[in-house]
Regions:
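Acidic carboxylate diad motif detector
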Residues: 1-123
């Protein structure tokens, strides 16, 4: 169990380039968007180009543990966020279970998946 609400970094997985990159996120961004759903909204707004096809490689899918996930306050939730193919706007799902805390325990506050792989791959 962690005693901090954020680790200060996210993982970017680019399937098109077959690359994984760590990105530092400022404390200011965490304070203004509060992790999980809010952080996901900010990161996707900054990264998905206007007019991107929700089912195309320009869309981004984010796995976003909540701000309190993995802390002594027993947060267990995480959000999955993306541009929705249903309405072309914001899409999200809120989930429970062990995935959110386990992601936080790896030292990352989110995983963002970009692009399209030429063949099936494991992340």
């Amino acid at each position: 169990m962690s005693d901090v609400a954020f680790n200060g970094k996210i993982l970017n997985v680019n399937l098109t380039k077959n690359e994984v990159e760590e990105e530092i996120i400022s404390e200011e961004v965490y304070r203004s968007h509060l992790g999980g759903y809010g952080l996901g909204a900010r990161l996707l707004f900054d990264r998905i180009p206007a007019g991107a096809d929700p089912l195309g490689p320009d869309n981004v899918i984010g796995f976003m543990p909540g701000l309190l996930t993995g802390t002594p306050l027993f947060g267990q939730r995480f959000s999955v966020v993306c541009k929705s193919p249903k309405n072309g706007g914001w899409g999200d799902a809120n989930c429970g279970g062990d995935f959110g805390p386990m992601l936080k325990f790896t030292g990352y506050d989110a995983v963002l998946v970009y692009g399209k792989s030429e063949k099936p791959v494991y992340i």
